[in-house]
Amino acid sequence: MNVINCEEVKRDEFHTEKYYESYNIFGAHVVTEDEIQGVRFTVWAPHAKAMSVVGDFNEWDYEQHKMLQVTEEGIWSLFIPHIEEGEIYKYAIETLAGDVILKADPYAVYAEVRPNTASVVFDIKGYEWNDKNWNRKKKKKSIYKEAMTVYELHFGSWKKKEDGTLYSYREMVEELIPYVVEHQFTHIEIMPLVEHPYDRSWGYQGTGYYAATSRFGTPHDLMHFVDECHKYGIGVILDWVPGHFCKDAHGLYLFDGTPTYEYKDKDVQENPVWGTVNFDLGKREVRNFLISNALFWMRYFHIDGFRVDAVANMLYWNKEGQEQSNEHAVSFLRELNEAVFAEDEDFLMTAEDSTAWPLVTTPTYEGGLGFNYKWNMGWMNDVLKYMECAPEYRKHIHEKMTFSLLYAYSENFILPLSHDEVVHGKKSLLNKMPGDYWDKFAQLRLLYGYFFTHPGKKLLFMGGEFGQFDEWKDLEDLDWNLHDFEMHRYMHDYFKELIALYKRSKPLWQLDHSPEGFQWIDANNNEQSIFSFIRQGDKQEDALVIVCNFTKATYENYKVGVPDFEYYNEILNSDAQQYGGSGQVNKKRLKTILEPYHNQAAHVEITIPPFGVSILRPVKTRKGSKKQDGSKTKVRSNVTSRGKR
């Protein structure tokens, strides 16, 4: 880290210009000045009357190490000789009211383990990375035309030691990475790892944005974990929260006794949804703090993506009775995305946004917000409501399963089955399914089959892969003992086979963001709650036919219109006995019948399993086969594109 001497910095650069290396100025840096080794402390506190650095090295005496104000706008700095890495410290701030308050360093890269709240001097330089091969391979691929399977997890509750203590960053290399590799996830998405005082905030209410939480080890330990993920071909996405922060006394809240990082106006300062306060995104120093922070995680931790939390809460003011857009936030998000993609054009910037705000994943130079992915919250809500409905009544809400295809190409979407849907009394995915024990597992297999064949990249929260029965318990770990039960083992086997099939099947991801990649065969069979569609890859022969039955009925000799290939093989059936199903499968090769059906040139007759998904792959095309109008067979989209990519 190239530390900048504050006296040499232009006064206005941090306060009035885009300055995205503010971590080089602020914080505690181990340096040598005038041939004396020590630590340079620098902080921004615009309304402080006086500032001191306090810690064990001066017995927390406010009078010993007074800081010098180096800009009129409130940058304070001090070099303290002969103190070293590992010292704990805080800033003692004399407010305009004459009080002295103690604050952790906003730019500290390390902190004490909670419940202690002091910052820790840590030299973040020196980690030797070994991920050049990962970076080289990443640049050769288009994230839009590749398979993407994201495993979302909470670091502290995925797995715990027998005594209930947490695994460290380094220990999780041995525990988590082999598991992720076995399941063929392409990425992990970790809930926030910034320093936070309250375990049950899950990291979303942070105090130390530059400090990887010390619950699990040092910053270098986390770097090692990321490095090892890259070694095994796993991308690392972090949850990141630039909208709001917690009100704990030692944190950013009223940092110098006045609103510093938050809005002054109480109407927009307070965030009643979470009991937090909102960042003042119109203030240049705050923007520099946050955008520098994003780049800091990219540069020093080699992170591959951010899932930007609560974008909807940023885009609109939370004034009671009003829904007015926050132009500060809109401008900030555009500036953020421009800075991130200038740093790494292959980075993943995903918006967690539940609104209908347009052009979220459109580049800023085309008038968009500039993200490259967005969670499809509408799909998630509609599909889960449909699945929770009793099967005999699903025909009355049939449109919940088809509506997503009206807007599927308006943005670059990730389909999230996330932590938000399996907590706070919402039940686990398995327990959302109606019916008896067998029905629940059959319908979860069906849901996953639909999930992996619907356009959009994939995200699943931990535990879903083996059918966690209880909803997520953040103070415990996953119910790993469920593997002792046969149906959970079947579910786990099914999930691993499904994700493997997804990854090796280009039609399921190659044209995720193009209407040419999807065609309904029959979207209107609400009476039987059966949906059939085609997923298409770049090549004509790269096509799959998918049939989903959302009732418990079994249908023999069911006609499905298909493109004119000579034969089809069933390559996956969720009702197979090895997955815990009843065994209503199509074992034999399916010969195409040259009679038009479902607006297709031909059809096959198959067995439709109860609560089942069947995936068919063409085997051989007829030479010169033609449709009724004389044109050659080609899969055409019948869904709506809204002009995005």
From Swiss-Prot:
Keywords from the UniProt entry: Carbohydrate metabolism, Glycogen biosynthesis, Glycogen metabolism, Glycosyltransferase, Transferase
Gene Ontology process terms (BP): glycogen biosynthetic process
Residue ranges with Polar residues bias: 636-645
Which Gene3D superfamilies would you find in this protein's record? Glycosidases, Golgi alpha-mannosidase II, Immunoglobulins
Metabolic or biological pathway: Glycan biosynthesis; glycogen biosynthesis
List the SUPFAM superfamilies hit by this protein, alphabetically: (Trans)glycosidases, Glycosyl hydrolase domain
Record carries keyword Transferase? yes
Is Glycosyltransferase there in the keyword field?
yes
Read off the InterPro entries from this record. A-amylase/branching_C (IPR006048), Branching_enzy (IPR037439), GlgB (IPR006407), GlgB_N_E_set_prok (IPR044143), Glyco_hydro_13_cat_dom (IPR006047), Glyco_hydro_13_N (IPR004193), Glyco_hydro_b (IPR013780), Glycoside_hydrolase_SF (IPR017853)
Gene Ontology terms for molecular function:
1,4-alpha-glucan branching enzyme activity; cation binding; hydrolase activity, hydrolyzing O-glycosyl compounds
Q: Which reaction does it catalyse?
A: Transfers a segment of a (1->4)-alpha-D-glucan chain to a primary hydroxy group in a similar glucan chain
Q: Which residues form the active site?
A: 309 (nucleophile), 352 (proton donor)
Pfam families, A to Z? Alpha-amylase, Alpha-amylase_C, CBM_48
Q: Quick one: where's region Disordered?
A: 619-645
Which Enzyme Commission number(s) are listed?
Answer: 2.4.1.18
Q: Name one GO cellular component term.
A: cytosol
How the protein assembles, per its UniProt entry?
Answer: Monomer.
| Record function comment | Catalyzes the formation of the alpha-1,6-glucosidic linkages in glycogen by scission of a 1,4-alpha-linked oligosaccharide from growing alpha-1,4-glucan chains and the subsequent attachment of the oligosaccharide to the alpha-1,6 position.
Q: Which PANTHER family match?
A: 1,4-ALPHA-GLUCAN-BRANCHING ENZYME
Could you say which protein family the record assigns here?
A: Belongs to the glycosyl hydrolase 13 family. GlgB subfamily.
What is this protein's record name? 1,4-alpha-glucan branching enzyme GlgB
Q: Please name the source species.
A: Bacillus cereus (strain ATCC 14579 / DSM 31 / CCUG 7414 / JCM 2152 / NBRC 15305 / NCIMB 9373 / NCTC 2599 / NRRL B-3711)
Highest classification ranks of the organism: Bacteria, Bacillati, Bacillota, Bacilli, Bacillales
